[in-house]
Amino acid sequence: RGLGDVYKRQVMDYVVVEAKGGRLTATIDKSINNLSNADVTVTVPANGSIRALDASSAAKISGDVVLNADKFAMDASSAAKIDVSVKAQSCAVAASSASKINASVEAVSCSVEASSASKITLKGSAAKCTADLSSAAKLSAGDFVAAECSVNTSSAAKAVVNCTERLHADASSGSSIRYSGDCQTSINKSSGGSVGRN
């Protein structure tokens, strides 16, 4: 056994996994404040009961199978990463504080919120999509086809979308929206915001 094996066993002693009210939480014991670069893997079976994912503080969540739900939500913050595939009636995707989400989504409706230099990459499709981006956040959804799409960007945020029917695009404060697809457009630009075809 190498030092790496000993370190992993020691780290596992401080992993706290709790199930409360239908929510599974995996964290490092709050009394420990000197762990750095700890790599802990928690495996959860995808038995059809996963409805939400929440990652923070540089944690990473990845899925090997498509997660099915009527309503699904994912939220990444503080440099966390989420990489999953989802099939749902409605899907909510939120990222903040330099976090990253890479998701394949098949949904009737999809809502996206991103802020503070976070990045969301989507592929798949939805009948309706709404996106709100601010503070240098990025949405890369050129491979995510939405029939109806409403996008609002501000404060140097950037969005790339693919819309086939109706697009409402509102860009302000140095932000930008680029779109593809044969869609009717309603465009508002202010304070250095830009909207254009990709």
Describe the residue ranges of each PLM region:
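Extended, compositionally simple hydrophobic/Ser/Thr-rich segments
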Residues: 42-44, 49-198
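Solvent-exposed adhesion/ligand-recognition segments of exported proteins
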Residues: 9, 14-21, 26
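Generic structural motif recognizing short loop/turn segments at the entrances and edges of beta-strands
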Residues: 1, 22-24, 36-40, 191
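Short, small-residue-biased leader/transition segments that mark boundaries at the very start
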Residues: 2-7
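Generic short beta-strand segments
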Residues: 27-30, 162
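Short, flexible active-site-adjacent loop segments at beta-strand->alpha-helix junctions, enriched
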Residues: 23, 30, 59
